[in-house]
UniProtKB/Swiss-Prot annotation:
It is an enzyme of class 4 (lyase). This is Dihydroxy-acid dehydratase. Its EC number is 4.2.1.9. The lineage of its organism: Bacteria, Pseudomonadati, Pseudomonadota, Gammaproteobacteria, Oceanospirillales. InterPro entries: Dihydro-acid_dehy_C, DihydroxyA_deHydtase, DiOHA_6PGluconate_deHydtase_CS, ILV_EDD_C, ILV_EDD_N, IlvD/EDD_N. The active site is at S515 (proton acceptor). Keywords: 2Fe-2S, Amino-acid biosynthesis, Branched-chain amino acid biosynthesis, Iron, Iron-sulfur, Lyase, Magnesium, Metal-binding.
Length: 614
């Protein structure tokens, strides 16, 4: 039977000094007999997805204490990818994921906490905390800050989000007034950006992994119903912590919940809903921390059998995450997958004995209670605000249309193969990924000529200067985990391609990655990356490249002999090999150099390769 970790610092005469310090934080004699729960917050005024989290930690803490635990809150960092986008700030985004994981490990292990409630929301924060949870392996519940409401303007029939503001800004025909209107309207409230971008994708996946409560991924940040998730998490964590330590119920440990089957469920959900390609990167990293052998090959296998049941922005302008909630949220999607026989429904969760048991209560297409129906009617108010729980608007009805609604049944799927695909070929021996949900059917098979750039900045300049033409495949290399370093997101280049009217006439191929807001024929995570000797570093201007998404292949149309000749010429450059031809005006700090030294390519999750120091 596991022993409460906190007893290390709260019991025994030799811990008098530690107890004295605990007393200085407000603890009493009675508190030393209770579990200590870490409330891991990520409040910051830099990020709209986290700006409202300041009081959430104490909301959870009060419930923990009312349920018989001791709550101790601390904060970790949060980088806003949208604000860091398009400049050297993006070099820090992906490395911050590992820094977040380390910081949570340091705090929780240094102070011997017994369990955690992780309050996350945006792109790297949720995966960073998930990595820490797997690493530490003590009871945990995730509760995120929730999605932003979609924007509205009289200038567009569709709802708006961040990507719309970026695309219109690069449209030379748009007036300054129109750009300003989109800018002011695209992000109206606190919360993670309103489409099925990386942040919302990851928060939805915590439901499929079994580590958060139903509604975590889709209940709006502004809605009063979200308050209940924080309260329930506070109460629930004390219960499962006591079961874990006092009843020897080992199945409450996150590594027991996040099994191989749970990772398959999460990836199955992501493919079905056409989520961000970044989730592949993060799930691989989280699985590695969990000791689960989940790989690109597993993702490729799933992508061939899981249908696409949902198209949400950026894959469609019609729906945003608030619409997914109205259609029954993530458990509605999981329910459709279960009825299709492609969900592991015996997986354990933090709230139910099995996923099947949870579906019987939470899938609105089964027999939902009036309370659950009202829960999924929670909708947007359309009032700009940075305040959580500030409105209680309800949709007049749920969206239960599984033929033409936001969520489809398998019989009415958008496509029989899902919204994410893994491609292999001589340019990506270890694979690359594409959000096929965002690719127009006319270019699922595309042959074009290489337009080679060696940085995101060069690619952006060439696109805006009209040097990129229809039929081009823009290569952006030396932007991988090592080469960037930090594997920058390429939202600006893809947005500008759309702004130039080339969205159905061009492709972009990179060893970097894409924002969850990216759509179009955008292929990322090319592995091995150029800086690690990948063949993407051998491509030259004018080379023909064939992309075949249905057959999961991508190849530069060169003979093996020609590629070998180019590789030999590259290796002959010595210290200059596998580096950009021209020095880039990019300041790489010592911290980023350390990350680059240990970083693996994307097919391994861009995690640190600690075998170098073992």
């Amino acid at each position: 039977m596991p022993v409460y970790r906190s007893k290390t610092t709260t019991s025994g005469r030799n811990m008098a000094g530690a107890r004295a310090l605990w007393r200085a934080t407000g603890m009493t004699d009675d508190d030393f007999q209770k579990p200590i729960i870490a409330v891991v917050n990520s409040f910051t005024q830099f990020v709209p997805g986290h700006v409202h989290l300041k009081d959430m930690g104490q909301l959870v803490a009060r419930e923990i204490e009312a349920a018989g635990g001791v709550a101790k809150e601390f904060n970790t960092i949060a980088v806003d990818d949208g604000i860091a986008m398009g400049h050297d700030g993006m070099l820090y985004s992906l490395p911050s994921r590992d820094l977040i994981a380390d910081s949570v490990e340091y705090m929780v292990n240094a102070h011997c906490a017994d369990a955690m409630v992780c309050i996350s929301n945006c792109d790297k924060i949720t995966p960073g905390m998930l990595m820490a949870a797997m690493r530490i392996n003590i009871p945990v519940i995730f509760v995120s800050g929730g999605p932003m409401e979609a924007g509205k303007t009289k200038l567009s029939e569709n709802k708006l989000d961040l990507v719309d503001a970026m695309v219109i800004a690069a449209d030379p025909t748009a007036t300054d007034e129109r750009v300003a209107e989109y800018e002011r309207s695209a992000c109206p409230t606190c919360g993670s950006c309103s489409g099925m971008f990386t942040a919302n994708s990851m928060n939805c996946l915590t439901e499929a992994l079994g580590l958060s409560l139903p509604g975590n991924g889709t209940t709006l940040a502004t809605h009063s119903d979200r308050r209940r998730l924080f309260l329930d998490a506070g109460r629930r964590i004390v219960d499962i912590t006591k079961r874990y330590y006092e009843n020897d119920e080992a199945n409450w440990a996150p590594r027991s919940i996040a099994s191989f089957e749970a990772f398959e469920n999460a990836m199955t959900l992501d493919i079905a809903m056409g989520g961000s390609t970044n989730t592949i990167l993060h799930l691989l990293a989280i699985a590695r921390e969990a000791g689960v052998d989940f790989s690109m090959e597993d993702i490729d296998r799933l992508s061939r059998k899981v249908p696409q049941l949902c198209k949400v922005a950026p894959n469609s302008p019609k729906y945003h995450v608030e619409d997914v909630h109205r259609a029954g949220g993530i458990f509605a999607l999981l329910g459709e997958l279960d009825r299709g026989g492609i969900l592991h429904n015996q997986c354990h969760t933090v709230h139910s004995k099995t996923m099947l048991e949870a579906l019987k209560s939470w899938d609105i297409m089964r027999s939902p209670t009036p309370e659950i129906i009202e829960f999924y009617k929670a909708g947007p108010a359309g009032i700009p605000t940075q305040t959580a729980f500030s409105q209680s608007t309800r949709w007049p009805s749920l969206d239960g249309d599984r033929a033409e609604g936001c969520i489809r049944s398998i019989e009415n799927a958008f496509s029989l193969e899902g919204g994410l695909a893994v491609l292999y070929g001589n340019i990506a021996v270890d694979g690359c990924v594409v959000k096929s949900a965002g690719v127009d059917e006319s270019i699922l098979v595309f042959e074009g000529r290489a337009h080679v750039t060696e940085s995101q900045d060069e690619a952006v300049k060439n696109i805006l200067d009209d040097k990129v033409e229809a039929g081009d495949i823009v290569i952006v290399r030396y932007e991988g985990p090592k080469g960037g370093p930090g594997m920058q997101e390429m939202l600006y280049p893809t947005s500008y391609i759309k702004s130039k009217g080339l969205g159905k006439a061009c492709a972009l191929l990179t060893d970097g990655r894409f924002s969850g807001g990216t759509s179009g024929l955008s292929i990322g995570h090319v592995s091995p990356e150029a800086a690690a000797g990948g063949a993407i570093g051998l491509v030259e201007n004018g080379d023909r490249i064939l992309i075949d998404i249905p057959n999961r292949s991508i190849n530069v149309l060169l003979s093996d002999e020609e590629l070998a000749k180019r590789r030999a010429a590259m290796e002959a450059k010595g210290a200059a090999a596998w580096k950009p031809v021209e020095m880039r005006p990019r300041k790489v700090s010592p911290a980023l150099k350390v990350y680059a030294h240990f970083a693996t390519s994307a097919d391994k999750g861009a995690v640190r390769d600690i075998s170098q120091i073992d």
